[in-house]
A protein has these predicted regions:
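Alpha-amylase-like alpha-glycosidases and glucanotransferases acting on alpha-linked glucans and related
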Residues: 1-22, 30-149, 206-207
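Metal-dependent catalytic neighborhoods of phosphoester/phosphodiester hydrolases
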Residues: 26
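Loop/helix patches that line or flank the sugar-binding groove of alpha-linked glycan CAZymes
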Residues: 41-43, 63, 71, 98-101, ...
Length: 223
């Protein structure tokens, strides 16, 4: 259905959890995903499969083109931007060793087979801009956009949209709701996302909330 409408592929949530009680290495899950990949190659060869799996040697063996590094499990990804003492923080107290060890092993196990994705964030964690200014974010993006693999930008991160702490939980989002506010396209009612002055998840009410239109006009902006 979605592919016939023009979608370019699927980002599969919890891709490693489809088969319950699978054996170590998830062989049953891998076989099932291989069947789906074979269907795509036959019917929609232009489409891509991206997995929320976190073990690229398994997910790519299962037919996915790309796999995300995740914010749960080993602390490799969280040690970069989040966690108690992230590497990309002004204080300079972080340690990148765990990330490098994990990423190097992932890269070696998938060389020539598929891509590892380091996301700027997602809907389940505080935004990258939390606790950082635009200079900090430029350094983060210089890293993300030059590492091997395929970088993924969570919507709004490209303009430094802020994490909105303390807003009401929506749809069981709890603290995660603060990373799910509407995209801020331009400085007018509804930020160009809607013509309404209110939205299901609140807007950033800050006077200096970043917008796409303003950043595109500024040669020194994060955009």
């Amino acid at each position: 259905f979605w592919l016939d409408l023009g979608a370019d592929g699927f980002r599969v949530d919890k891709a490693l959890k489809l088969v319950k009680d699978d054996d170590e290495g998830r062989p049953a899950n891998i076989r099932l995903r291989q069947d789906f990949r074979a269907f795509l190659e036959r019917e929609y060869p232009h489409c891509a499969m991206v997995s929320e799996w976190g073990v690229p040697k398994e997910s790519i063996a299962g037919g996915f083109h790309m796999d995300f590094m995740l914010h749960f499990g080993p602390p490799a990804y969280t040690s970069l931007f989040r966690g108690e003492r992230p590497f990309f923080a002004k204080e300079g107290e972080g340690d990148i060793t765990a990330f490098l060890d994990t990423f190097s092993a992932m890269l070696a196990s998938t060389d020539g087979k598929g891509l590892i994705c380091i996301p700027s964030g997602n809907h389940d964690m505080p935004r990258l801009a939390r606790g950082r200014d635009m200079r900090d974010l430029k350094i983060c993006f210089a890293f993300l956009l030059t590492m091997p693999g395929a970088p993924f930008l969570y919507y709004g991160d490209e303009i430094g949209m802020r994490y909105l702490a303390g807003i009401p939980s929506v749809e069981g989002g709890y603290f995660r709701t603060g990373s799910r506010s509407p995209m801020q396209w331009e400085r007018r009612t509804g930020f160009g996302f809607t013509s309404s002055a209110t939205s299901y998840i609140p807007f950033d009410k800050s006077a200096d909330a970043p917008t796409v239109s303003e950043q595109r006009a500024d040669a020194d902006s994060l955009w």
